[in-house]
């Protein structure tokens, strides 16, 4: 009998694409599925509840407040009954065979920690993400793979990063690692989880035979909240995981030089950076308690 996979679909204020996301899971050929929709409370929570009510086999977790991406996914992980957990969002639709392809790989490779499909833009069909590689150097570098690299072909390949909106893992591993960090709320939480998975001795793998379609976000600048957490959580990730030799140069670059330049050019964004640094400073005792200085392998960016 196929192992039970719990599919967690996180939803926040987007009832329209949620139906397609649920249907794409139900239509998977994989025979043993447990589906959980987690609603982060919003003004559209009632509409989301109505969508979920159309699918009797789907379990519904309604958070009393918006816990962000990290907290919402953690609520889904806590509710999961499966031996394996696939994390997804309401704006992601699985292509046929997606779960079966990932499960076939994960079951055969005990050293694989996180497995992810290739993520495509739904409108254009172009590759949005096939994973990525990064380096926690004085200047942060993250390279997202948006096309197949020479020599990769259709076979699974190792990466260092996969987006949190489409991850398959063993439930035991996610629970041992305590899922995402709740204090990250949103943005960079997937990067930080990937680092912990790698440091635990597991691999992060992209399976090209598996694919998902991502609904294109509406055009426009990121909100102040998004910018704040994107900056804050990158700084926090360095405190948690970067080599000690890197931290002075990183703080000088991003905490002094970049902040000063940004305040002069764009005061609004500059003060967001100041707030982000202050938040990290106030969280320093907890971050330093959780710090794991073990090195990562060279990123080969």
Segments from the language model and where they lie:
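Short, acidic, metal-binding catalytic loop of nucleotide-sugar glycosyltransferases
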Residues: 23-32
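Short aromatic/hydrophobic "clamp" motif used to bind/position activated sugar donors
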Residues: 85
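Donor nucleotide-sugar recognition loop
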Residues: 159-167, 175-206, 210-213, 222-229
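Glycine-rich, basic loop-to-helix element that forms the pyrophosphate-binding segment
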Residues: 63-80
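Cell-envelope/extracellular polymer assembly enzymes that use nucleotide-activated donors
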Residues: 4-6, 34, 192
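Catalytic core of nucleotide-sugar-dependent glycosyltransferases
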Residues: 204, 209-212, 222-247, 270-287
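Non-catalytic, C-terminal membrane-associated alpha-helical segments of glycosyltransferases
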Residues: 245-301
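Acidic/His-rich active-site region of diverse nucleotide-sugar glycosyltransferases
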Residues: 78, 93, 98-179, 183, ...
